[in-house]
């Protein structure tokens, strides 16, 4: 867990238990050491530093996005591996009722000269922009072990998606920035069924939500 905060990053001794970075998760395949990433909040900066320090021999990686609010993309320009010309980065999202027509534009816009000194096209890495057109899709990375990715839309202002990743008989589910309302959405329950790990948002207690 490289970032679990919402909205904005924070610093200070009072935040040491959970850290101060915004959303970013790393998934690592223990057999091959290959990594995948979910969301690119400020936590992705440290993830990138660790990736380089560990000298991982990986020429391709996936970064999946639950949605594109600032706290899920604001670390992307500071992801050091993205400046490696020998790396291919697949940026993945699910299209939906508000279908993203140009996934590249989301990242290129926040790196325009007005906002950031380096344009996306000058970062170095090769970028591949993938929009899931189905709820489930299977990808086969260079290690030859298929990864099934299932996306399920859940309640959040502007829309967001929970993801289920299945590989080698194991499953992990990420359901972040999720709001159930009075009842839990059955689709999300089904998505999480029999998962080995469920990562679920718990930003507000009932008492906090009142305020």
Predicted regions and their residues:
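Binuclear metal-dependent hydrolase catalytic cores
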Residues: 1-173
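Cap/insert and terminal regions of metallo-dependent hydrolase folds
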Residues: 171, 179-211
